[in-house]
Structure formats: structure tokens, C-alpha cells
Amino acid sequence: MKKLGLIISAVFLTLGVACADVDRPISVEELPQKAQKFLKAHFSERDVSFAKEDPEFMYKDYEVVLTDGTKIEFASDGEWTSVDCRYGSVPMAIVPKQIEDYLKKNYPNVTVLGIDHERKEYEVRLNNRLELTFDKQFRLIDIDD
């Protein structure tokens, strides 16, 4: 009986994982309102090339690729989690003021190519190949080159 329970559990786990990893192309209008507002506020001059919904086990993520190669990722609530500008720079309005001030003081001639926002930290990628990590109080906690 224990083996049967393990087999059934394994089957459901496998089905759950398989079903959870099916990306679905979507229109911009299907993004959460918060994500739509973010795109209009910071990237209105660029067209959306592709948008997709990435359902995970307990939540959904969203990914948007703009025609200039910029890739933006959103959490299920529409909050941005990552902005990666391949051929340009991240709009400074996205960068928290404390990080912007730090960059102006310590790296005045660089541009931000990408920024990731996780629950406890921000990671900022600069055009001088440095990656700076800040904690949630915006203190620098790591530099990678």
C-alpha cells in the first residue's frame, strides 16, 4: 500500500511540474495592470515584440521583450523583477534614488544596463562590467566583475 501511495504521489508531482512549465504567449493587455502602467511610464517609445505568461506551481511570472531587445520580467502582481537593456540603458526613474545617488557619487560616467529586484536585494549591472548588489536598505553588499 505504501508503494502505491508513493507511485501516485510521484505521478501527481510529475504532472504538476510538467503542467507548470508551459509558457503562453499573451498580449500586453493580458499583463497585470501594474505591469502595463510600468511599460507605459518607462518604455512608451518602444514597441513590445513579445509577451508571455510563465505559470509556475503556485504563481505566474510574465516576460516582455521590446523591439530594441530590452527584456523585462514581472511577478504575478505586476511588480517588475528584472530589466535588462541589451543595447541601451535602464531608465534612471526605475533605479531607486539611494542607488542612483551612490552611482552618481562613485561611478559618475557609467550607465545601468540591467537591474534585478528581489525580495531582499537589488542587483545592478553597469556598462563597465561591474555588478553591484545592494540590500533592502540600499547598502552596497557585493561587487562582482
Label each residue range with its predicted role.
Residues 1-23, 39:
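Bacterial Sec-dependent N-terminal signal peptides
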